[in-house]
Amino acid sequence: MKNVPVPLKHTNWGGFTLNSKGLRTPEYQVNKSPNSIRIITIGDSFTFSSNLPYPYHFTVILEDKLESWLRNDVEIINLGIPSVGPQYEQKMLEIEGMRLNPDLVIWAFFVGNDFTDETPLGKEKEISISQNILTKCYFCRLIRNGYILYSYIRTPGARKINKTRESTSGTYIGSPNDYDPNKPTFEKGKFIKIQSVRMSIYAKETFPWDQWKSIQQTLIEVRDTCRYYKIPLLVVIIPDENQVNSNLLEEVVKELRKTMDDFQMGYPQKLLTDFFERYEIDYLDLLPVFKKMGDEKSLYTLQDTHWNIDGNLLAAETIFKYLVDRKASLFNITKSSYNGR
C-alpha cells in the first residue's frame, strides 16, 4: 500500500494501535478463512474512527451483529482513512480492497465534506499553483485538513493522538472510559464556523457542482470495478449534523444571517439517491432514521462533527437491518447457507 499514504503504522490512535498498514483495524491476511464472510468498509474519518473508542465504532458493532445472525465468522476490514475524499477512497479500494476478495464493499459517503474534498475535473488550470498542489498531493491535503481540525481543539488533552510506536499492532489497548461524551472537541464559536461553511451544499447557488461531476465519475468507476470483480457494493450516505440537530441548524443559520428558506437541507441526499437509482448502485440513506432519532437524543459528539456512541450504534443497527431485511443477497449467500461454525 505504498501508493496510498495512511497514518503511521503502530501509532496509538485513541487507544487503538494501528496495524502494520497504518489502518485502524486488526491485522489481516490476504486470503480469508474458508467459509468466512469478509466485508470491506471504505470512507473518511467517520469510517476510520469517528473519534470514539474502538468497541463503540459502527463497523465493530456491525461485525458482531452479523456474526450472531449468520452464526458464522464475519471479518470487517476497515480501510477508512481520515481527511480524504472520494478519489483517495477509490484508490484505497483499488489498491488494497480488491486484492482481499471481499464478499461485500460498504462505502460510507459523508455529505458534510465529501462533496468539497473532491478534486474538480478539468479545473487544474483555473486554480493557483498552491491550490493545485493541495488537490494533487495527499500529504498536503492531509496537513491542510489536519491543521483545520486540530487547530480548533479546545484543550491540549482532548482526544490527542499518541505517536509513540507500540509493540502490538491492530489491537485495542485503551478503555471505553477514555471517552467523555460531555467534553467538546471544538470551542463553540469554532464549531459553529465549521458547520456554517458546510451550508454551501444545501443551496443550488453555492453547491460545488464541479466537484459533484468528479464524484459521479468516481462512483461510476467504483461501481464498475466492483462489478468486474463480481463484488457487491453498498453506499451508505452519512448525514451532516446540520441535517439532524435542529437546534444546531438554527444557530448556524443565524450565524450566516440567513433564513431557513435559503436552504434545502435534503438537497445533497436528493442528488445522490437520484444518481444511484439512475446508475443502479445500491445505497442506504441514513438521514431519515437519524433525523427521526435526532429529535429524541443526541447522535453526534458535542461540538465534534462526528457521531457519538448512540450515533454509531444507530448506524450499525440500520445497516444491519438493511442487509438482513432487504439485501442479504448482497453477500451472495443466505442465512440458511451457514448454520453453524
PLM region descriptions:
Residues 1-70, 180-186, 270-272, 290-294, ...:
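Membrane/wall-proximal cationic-aromatic binding patches
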Residues 38-42, 77, 105:
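Conserved beta-strand elements of the Class I
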Residues 70-91, 95-98:
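A conserved hydrophobic secondary-structure block that centers on an alpha-helix together
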Residues 86, 90, 212, 216, ...:
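Short, amphipathic alpha-helical "lid/cap" segments that border enzyme active or binding sites
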Residues 97, 101-106:
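Proline-aspartate-enriched helix->loop->beta-strand connector
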Residues 110-276, 281, 289-294, 331-341:
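Serine-dependent acyl-ester chemistry module
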Residues 303-341:
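Histidine-centered active-site loop/cap adjacent to the catalytic His
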